[in-house]
Amino acid sequence: MSEPAFFPLPTPLTLDEVAALSGARLARPGAQDALRLTGVGTLADAGPSELAFLDQSRYLATLGTARAGAIITSEKFAGEVPEAIAVLVSPRPASAFVAVTRQLFPQALRPQPVFGHTGIAPGAFIHPTASLEAGVTVDPGAVIGPGAEVGAGSVICANAVVGAGVRIGRDSTIGAGVSLSHALVGNRVIVHAGARIGQDGFGYQPGPGGHLKVPQIGRVVLQDDVEVGAGSTIDRGALRDTVIGEGTKIDNLVQIAHNVVIGRHCIIVSQTGISGSTTLGDFVMLGGQVGVVGHCTIGDGAQIAASSNVKGDVPPGVRWGGSPAKPVREWFREMTTLKKLAESRARSGAATPGEEE
């Protein structure tokens, strides 16, 4: 459910407009022609003027009490929807639903300026040598340093710091409290609140007199359509750039070390840590709390299960899991074997390691 205080009430949509936006087909043409949809919700919570979706059989039981005005679902479940509810059919109900939600609530797609309008707010600090194109918004307390460049339509939210020489493309958003240094940022990039981009990497040369700090003279490059979650950190490179490829989405609380190169359209979930000089191919997916050691390569399209520990190269297109990570089938066999062994020992009365008195 949306809250009008946070997201303005959208312009109502007819069923025909919803069908056009989503690519879905009206299953009952002529029914509910007068319906106007003004919001979205879950199958359990959506009201008579709201849209919901159904794409899994586990939620079929909810249909009996559903009050939604319309539901997007697959051909498989369309006949299960009560007659009082309008039905739109799509081969990908969730994607169709998201397309409509984006139209209704465009403000939810990126952080919004505090004052809600374009321009330089009172209390913003912009160096005289910084260059801002027309249509840039800078919130109170934000700092834009010497020689920095910000493209048209971009938003610098409250208390963000854009360091000297940083270049930000067009229609990008730098969230509240972000620090951004030694970085090149593309178009339509979103960096959420509190992220840290471009600080020096963790590099020290051990010696008998202590640890000698290694200068980090590279940059961070965020290509077009990258999104970085709140509280995530991306270190600049030591000698080469740290690069986040086009369309890659990074969740909250992710650590990316110096010299890491991440390909296009990757998904990196919360609490993942990627050590220095590691390379990810395109469309790689890392589950939550994955750890990746340094100087290894993960191939295009590979998927790593949550809480796994990657200690070496991973081939393209595979699914790995465990610690150390290995092919999923092998990991499952090991887990099954251990479970059976523990059950066998329990039946025989033998003590399990760690339980001896």
From Swiss-Prot:
Disulfide bonds: none annotated. Keywords: Acyltransferase, Lipid A biosynthesis, Lipid biosynthesis, Lipid metabolism, Repeat, Transferase. It holds the Pfam family Hexapep. One of its GO terms (cellular component) is membrane. The active site is at residue 258. Its EC number is 2.3.1.191. It comes from the Bacteria. It catalyses: a UDP-3-O-[(3R)-3-hydroxyacyl]-alpha-D-glucosamine + a (3R)-hydroxyacyl-[ACP] = a UDP-2-N,3-O-bis[(3R)-3-hydroxyacyl]-alpha-D-glucosamine + holo-[ACP] + H(+). It is an enzyme of class 2 (transferase). One of its GO terms (biological process) is lipid A biosynthetic process. Pathway: Bacterial outer membrane biogenesis; LPS lipid A biosynthesis. GO terms for molecular function: N-acyltransferase activity. Transmembrane segments: none annotated. Catalyzes the N-acylation of UDP-3-O-acylglucosamine using 3-hydroxyacyl-ACP as the acyl donor. Is involved in the biosynthesis of lipid A, a phosphorylated glycolipid that anchors the lipopolysaccharide to the outer membrane of the cell. PANTHER family: UDP-3-O-ACYLGLUCOSAMINE N-ACYLTRANSFERASE, UDP-3-O-ACYLGLUCOSAMINE N-ACYLTRANSFERASE 1, MITOCHONDRIAL-RELATED. Homotrimer. HAMAP family: LpxD (MF_00523). Belongs to the transferase hexapeptide repeat family. LpxD subfamily. This is UDP-3-O-acylglucosamine N-acyltransferase. The gene is lpxD.
